[in-house]
Amino acid sequence: MASSGGELGSLFDHHVQRAVCDTRAKYREGRRPRAVKVYTINLESQYLLIQGVPAVGVMKELVERFALYGAIEQYNALDEYPAEDFTEVYLIKFMNLQSARTAKRKMDEQSFFGGLLHVCYAPEFETVEETRKKLQMRKAYVVKTTENKDHYVTKKKLVTEHKDTEDFREDLHSEMSGFCKAAEALNTSAGNSNPYLPYSCELPLCYFSSKCMCSSRGPVDRASDSSKDGRNHHKTMGHYNHNDSLRKTQINSLKNSVACPGAQKAITSSEAVDRFMPRTTQLQERKRRREDDRKLGTFLQTNPSGNEIMIGPLLPDISKVDMHDDSLNTTANLIRHKLKEVISSVPKPPEDKPEDVHTSHPLKQRRRI
Amino acid sequence: MAQKPKVDPHVGRLGYLQALVTEFQETQSQDAKEQVLANLANFAYDPSNYEYLRQLQVLDLFLDSLSEENETLVEFAIGGLCNLCPDRANKEHILHAGGVPLIINCLSSPNEETVLSAITTLMHLSPPGRSFLPELTATPVVQCMLRFSLSASARLRNLAQIFLEDFCSPRQVAEARSRQAHSALGIPLPRSVAPRQR
């Protein structure tokens, strides 16, 4: 059966509002009741057809309302279009497709001057060039989005592997000494970080000395390229010209995984973008990061009491002053010793009450005899 | 009525898509199949879902549904393919799975949306640059496009014209045109059904 018109401005099947689906299974019911319809790029258009506009001379208001969603190129009333009594039909052409999509989504089924608007696309009004451009833009958008996504996926894989080898990392850290460990951490972070997040390379760089910077700059670029191509972490690590034995143990124990605070930082800074992490994992991450910072801090500052559980800020050590008198020195030492005892005894009970620690900690510290 | 699988709200996008696919495969209700297929086809519009859709083999599900008798299912399936085929990985999957003949078959559907989606899908499947996929520019297909370019429907005319201009060489078009003059009726034009006016 032929349609009532192939001419522009006549009723088409895709203009008709379909009935809302009421037999949907509960788990797939959306927030708004919707018809069963598939939207393809063919159906979407910068041209919108608006039906159900009350015939009370509100064209200007209508256009102003739609203009909220984007620039409008042209608009006109469609007088020949079959319309309900006392309603008018308008055609609005937006400058770009995205505005039209938003406008349709927001304005469809909205009340307007007492009438209910029905908004739909009108691709039949497009010229050949407009259709061609529409298809090309859609293709470009998809290609660009999936290319970006590929790199996020690479980063995601690195993160999940990183979590698996947490234990490996702890062991490695305890084995190696200060600077070497820092260098290793720098290597892994630089080598396996996302090439599209250059700051992830730079963050650990500014932590550590400039010695690392020059030598790892070159490999970073090569590493990023090869990780993009093959995702073969053996190769990326092979490019590094640091300590050979260090590298080998790295490769053997870590294999394809990342292990360093730098990568953690890069990941968390872009957490909001793509990753869904349950809250418990976030808390664990933060705890781990705190511990790593502490460990790095202790390595750099050579804290003798390395096994303390530190809660709250690291207070400055009380300087030891020689009083040039034996009895005075003894007294001073006793007091210092007492203070240390008091400080160290505080963290133990309030593992359940961290707030008390924070408040009681400075109080005890300030007591002077 | 369709079944109601228990889906945890926290299961995420992949879980939801999995539930849809499962329902599609298990349900007996045509309505439910249509709803689920439409849902999947709309998901196929958003590139962020492509990884999941490939994982769940939804592309094969779409290709299989092209052979269904229910015209609505075919319309939704080809719509889904049309939505996701600009992506390179999806395109390769469809080509390797032998999807091109199935999509060419859709050109003879009486449903206008199906035909439009099929044409667009074929255009996206063409390799970039001026090299053409031989199946796409075979004479029957070009002849079909020539007939579409004379259609009363503006949308069909436009798409056919773009296909002939951008995806066929002038020689192929000329050859198809000359053969058409002698051959019997080719692929029938689709019709779009509009409801009667009040």
From Swiss-Prot, chain B:
ARM repeats lie at residues 57-99, 100-140. The keyword Lyase does not apply. Keywords: mRNA processing, mRNA splicing, Phosphoprotein, Repeat, Spliceosome. GO terms for cellular component: spliceosomal complex. The modification Phosphoserine is found at S169. SUPFAM superfamilies: ARM repeat. The keyword Phosphoprotein applies. GO terms for biological process: mRNA processing; RNA splicing. It holds the Pfam family Arm. Component of the minor spliceosome. Within this complex, interacts with RBM48. As a component of the minor spliceosome, involved in the splicing of U12-type introns in pre-mRNAs. PANTHER family: ARMADILLO REPEAT-CONTAINING PROTEIN 7. This is Armadillo repeat-containing protein 7. It comes from Homo sapiens. The gene is ARMC7.
